[in-house]
Amino acid sequence: MALRELEFTSHNGTDTIQAWVYEPAVTPVAVVQLIHGLGEHSRRYLHMTAALVDAGFVVVADDHAGHGRTAMQSGTWGDAGDESATVIVQDEVTLYRKAKELFPDLPYVVFGHSLGSMIARALVLQPGVEVDGLALGGIAVGMRGVESTLDREALKAAVAADGSAPAADALVGQLFDGFLDRFAAARARGFEAVEYLFPYAFPAC
């Protein structure tokens, strides 16, 4: 396996996106653009990347603005800037274009997990983006129960604020209500692995 490191300026104009190209030792059969989820980074998928490369695929992946090595370099965590959804999608468009320049004749597949599945769906709808396959995992569609649990007035106030202060823990808890229930239940039953992993469970989104 050969590894290339790429950098490019984020759509937000401030971050330098860190990206990687993993190439097989054999003639490649296709490119897979891997898009990670909320609060994680692309190297969380190294086991999947290794399996794909062993099967002859090129894998391209980056760490979103506010995530992973990109955030380590900028010092800004969890914040892609104004219009963050647009920023992250356009950064994936940039990575797509760079990959197509490197491998113009190979079939192209996009894979996204959780938030990455939402980004992947937006990516393939962008002008000039043509793919041969779309694979989605941990598909995020809506937030279960948010209609009844969310304090909408508190959310409006948080959105209207200048953004210098983080959202209240209670509000964040309402937004992600139910996401960790299965971990909490297993922890209560004394599962040691879950006890160890529980502090890191949230990045699995």
Language model feature labels by segment:
Residues 81-100:
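Alpha/beta-hydrolase active-site loop
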Residues 1-26:
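N-terminal cap/lid segment of alpha/beta-hydrolase-fold proteins
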Residues 42, 49-75:
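Conserved alpha/beta-hydrolase
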